[in-house]
């Protein structure tokens, strides 16, 4: 057909076929005869005008071209189809490439010329309610497409409709027969129909094939003749939830595919299978529960019990190189207890201590190691958590569950049986950083924390993988199977391999106070001036007014430790503190406001004139103070004025402590500024030939060096001896002790820095410190504790 004729045909293509159009043009030519002024285009226009003015009989409506049977359907046609319904699949869900969810169902219809699959899409699913198997229907406005294997399919469109016809008008259509096959007679054959009762529903399981993950779920079904398994795959898995299928339901399954597996014929759901729940004549199912006390080596048993212990999963490598996982739990009923072993996907079931669990299809084996029977699950095992009803046993287990509540911390603190396992719920009150340690089988990790509830708090040691678990102060946690450990001062807990740290259950949170409420309940806020020896459970709000660098030391057991000295002050006074290990590494700066909780208040008398000090260790907590905490706390400058009153040098005496003086340095001596001390006894070192301290007798591998710079300081009122030690000596010299040691060692001259020290003469300094009487010169001497200011 020429292009210009095609354009004319486009005007009436919905009325006649191209062949009809060409036929009409030829007829019109014969009618007009030899009329030279009319070409083909003019004749075609005349034909089109005639068609548009009157109703024409289309070629497709002529008997010889009409698509009125299934065998005559042609691909691409939009036409009604008529047939008897032979199969209706259950609707299945799918997800489009754009992420939208849709549904489809397959309906097989047949007439006396063949069968046709009709595909009902999301908009058409509601039409399935209008008919059932055996009905004769006409589906209007369907699109005929090529399907799998070259077979044609009818795809419904949004405007498609379904009309149920009188079957007596179509006696030639094949008859619908619904033959039910007893489960005991199943063979590996074509599709079958069964009526059965569901005796078990598995969890949804996953598998991997060709790099893609799939899903499946299995239903155990039975009738009077036998039992088998019915499996649904991938998107069809959703049918179980959509239809609300559960154990005990009766169902009719139409057009399932029998398959042989392990010498047993099972059923598989296909794209044409339909599941119809209903009231059917099949035997009732009652599964026999085996009491735990009656267990022996047996297969395919069902037990129910209360979960009394849950262990974390453990991964392992199979012989084929793949990774598996195993997890054990312990259950109990009114006759005894048993360990249950879960494998792979079952290890990911969220099972909590206190859950009631029913396990069906498990095997019982004798465990030689524990000399007891163990329940071993397998691929076909069904696990049901907290079943709705299972008779008297369920009530007994629910009563037992009430007795398994976690213990209050105050109750644990009263326990005396070391090694006993307990459960506890609380909030993390303090938390140290993990640290490594060496043991016989390699390196371990340990971390300490304090847990608190409304009754008290307790220290817990976390070991290895428990120490690496992400946690934050204030988090609410449930700790199961922690072991009692009798600590130096009180009962502690140890969280090791069999311990579980999980989120609390909803009922655990009912009475648990917030972190802020716990702080107020457990700690008493005290001013520094009100502290007493052995104070416990106190809180101090103060500022850092002095801070030394952390230093390492060796404990009595040979392990390394870390300690840092600091001084804190509030509006009532100041106090020195020792920060140990993790606390020594806290980021602190002079002037910082801090909140110190649960320090130990100790009495020190090792330097003459006893005083209280704070010991801040693993059971203590030191954190930045909040805005609310800062109410009433003076600024750093205000504290300096309050704590360190200015004194003229002429007014100094032996009782002048924590005073501030300002003056000019004079007579600064740099001849011997390095004191060598024994690291064991801290006495001035006088070595024998064998590098042994003559005072304590210890072998000295590396001495400790103390920098000290003597001189005098004067102001308008007088002058006094002054000696800078350690950190303060480094401050005015602007060198570290290590740098001084290196220079002196390299030069082999103790006075190598004499000129640098003498350059300090004439420098004005403002220092805080104490005055005392020098025993050698019997003259007053000032010992700076802090260099506040240095200027030329």
From Swiss-Prot:
The keyword Secreted does not apply. It comes from the Archaea. GO terms for molecular function: DNA binding; zinc ion binding. Keywords: DNA damage, DNA repair, DNA replication, DNA-binding, Metal-binding, Repeat, Zinc, Zinc-finger. One of its GO terms (biological process) is response to ionizing radiation. A zinc finger (C4-type) spans 678-696. It holds the Pfam family tRNA_anti-codon. Disulfide bonds: none annotated. InterPro entries: Cdc24_OB3, NA-bd_OB-fold, NA-bd_OB_tRNA, Rep_factor-A_C, SOSS-B. CDD domains: SoSSB_OBF. Residues 81-140, 192-273, 301-365, 422-494 bind DNA. Probably binds DNA polymerase PolB. Binds helicase Hel308, in presence and absence of DNA. Inhibits DNA polymerase activity of PolB, which can be overcome by RFC and PNCA. Stimulates 3'-to 5'-exonuclease activity of PolB at 30 degrees Celsius, but has no effect at 50 or 70 degrees Celsius. Bind ssDNA and replication forks; replication forks structures bind both Hel308 and this protein. Has no effect on helicase activity of Hel308; may help target the helicase to DNA substrates that require DNA re-modeling. This is Replication factor A. The gene is rpa.
């Amino acid at each position: 057909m020429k292009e210009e004729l095609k354009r004319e045909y486009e005007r009436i293509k919905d009325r006649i076929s191209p062949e009809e159009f060409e036929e009409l043009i030829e007829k019109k030519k014969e009618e007009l005869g030899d009329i030279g002024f009319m070409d083909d285009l003019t004749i075609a226009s005349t034909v089109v005008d005639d068609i548009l003015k009157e109703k024409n009989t289309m070629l497709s409506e002529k008997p010889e071209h009409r698509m009125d049977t299934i065998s005559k359907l042609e691909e691409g046609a939009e036409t009604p189809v008529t047939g008897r319904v032979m199969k209706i699949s259950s609707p299945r869900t799918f997800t489009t490439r754009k992420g939208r969810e849709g549904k489809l169902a397959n309906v097989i219809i047949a007439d006396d010329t063949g069968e046709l699959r009709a595909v009902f899409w999301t908009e058409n699913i509601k039409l399935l309610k209008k008919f059932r198997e055996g009905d004769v229907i006409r589906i209007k406005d369907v699109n005929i497409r090529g399907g799998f294997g070259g077979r044609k399919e009818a795809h419904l469109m949004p405007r498609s409709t379904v009309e149920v016809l009188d079957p007596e008008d179509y006696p030639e259509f094949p008859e619908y027969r619904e033959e039910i096959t007893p489960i005991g007679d199943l063979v590996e054959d074509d599709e079958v129909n069964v009526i059965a009762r569901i005796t078990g529903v598995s969890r949804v399981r996953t598998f991997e094939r060709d790099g893609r993950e799939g899903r499946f779920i299995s239903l155990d079904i039975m009738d009077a003749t036998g039992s088998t398994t019915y499996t649904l795959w991938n998107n069809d898995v959703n049918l179980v939830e959509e239809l609300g299928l559960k154990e005990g339901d009766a169902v009719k399954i139409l057009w399932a595919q029998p398959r042989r597996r392990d010498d047993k014929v099972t059923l598989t759901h296909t794209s044409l299978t339909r599941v119809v729940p209903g009231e059917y004549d099949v035997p009732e199912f009652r599964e026999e529960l085996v009491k735990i006390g009656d267990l022996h080596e047996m297969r395919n048993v069902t037990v129910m019990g209360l979960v009394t212990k849950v262990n974390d999963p453990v991964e392992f490598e199979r012989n084929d190189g793949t990774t598996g996982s195993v997890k054990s739990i312990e259950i109990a009923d009114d006759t005894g207890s048993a360990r249950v072993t879960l494998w792979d996907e079952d290890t990911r079931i969220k099972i909590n201590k206190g859950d009631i669990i029913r396990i069906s299809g498990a095997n019982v084996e004798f465990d030689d190691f524990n000399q007891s029977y163990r329940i071993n699950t397998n691929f076909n095992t069904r696990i049901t958590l907290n079943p709705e009803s299972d008779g008297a046993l369920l009530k007994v287990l629910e009563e037992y569950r009430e007795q398994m509540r976690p213990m209050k911390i105050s109750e644990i603190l009263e326990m005396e049986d070391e090694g006993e396992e307990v459960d506890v719920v609380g909030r993390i009150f303090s938390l140290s950083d993990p640290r490594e340690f060496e043991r016989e089988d390699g390196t371990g990790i340990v971390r300490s924390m304090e847990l608190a509830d409304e009754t008290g708090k307790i220290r817990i040691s976390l070991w290895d993988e428990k120490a690496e678990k992400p946690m934050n102060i204030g988090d609410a946690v449930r700790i199961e199977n922690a072991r009692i450990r009798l600590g130096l001062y009180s009962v502690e807990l140890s969280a090791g391999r069999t311990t579980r740290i999980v989120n609390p259950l909803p009922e655990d949170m009912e009475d648990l106070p917030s972190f802020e409420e716990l702080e107020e309940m457990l700690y008493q806020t005290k001013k520094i001036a009100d502290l007493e020896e052995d104070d416990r459970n106190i809180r101090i709000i103060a500022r850092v007014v002095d801070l030394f660098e952390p230093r390492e030391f060796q404990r009595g057991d040979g392990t390394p430790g870390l300690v840092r000295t600091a001084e804190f002050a509030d509006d009532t006074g100041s106090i020195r503190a020792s920060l140990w290990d993790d606390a020594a590494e806290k980021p602190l700066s002079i002037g910082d406001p801090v909140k110190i909780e649960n320090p130990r208040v100790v009495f020190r008398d090792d330097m003459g004139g006893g005083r209280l000090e704070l010991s801040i260790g693993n059971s203590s907590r030191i954190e930045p103070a909040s805005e609310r905490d800062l109410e009433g706390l003076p600024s750093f400058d205000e504290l300096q004025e309050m704590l360190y009153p200015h004194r003229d040098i002429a007014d100094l005496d032996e009782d002048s402590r924590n005073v501030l003086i300002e003056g000019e340095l004079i007579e600064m001596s740099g001849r011997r500024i390095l004191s060598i001390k024994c690291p064991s006894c801290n006495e001035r070192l006088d070595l024998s030939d064998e590098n042994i301290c003559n005072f304590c007798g210890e072998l000295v591998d590396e001495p400790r060096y103390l920098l000290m710079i003597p001189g005098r300081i004067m102001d308008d009122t007088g002058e006094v001896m002054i000696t800078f030690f350690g950190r303060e000596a480094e401050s005015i010299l602007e060198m570290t002790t290590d740098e001084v040691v290196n220079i002196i060692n390299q030069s082999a001259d103790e006075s190598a820095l004499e000129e640098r020290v003498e350059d300090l003469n004439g420098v004005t300094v403002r220092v805080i410190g104490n005055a005392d009487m020098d025993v050698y010169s019997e003259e007053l001497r000032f010992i700076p504790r802090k260099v506040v200011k240095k200027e030329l």
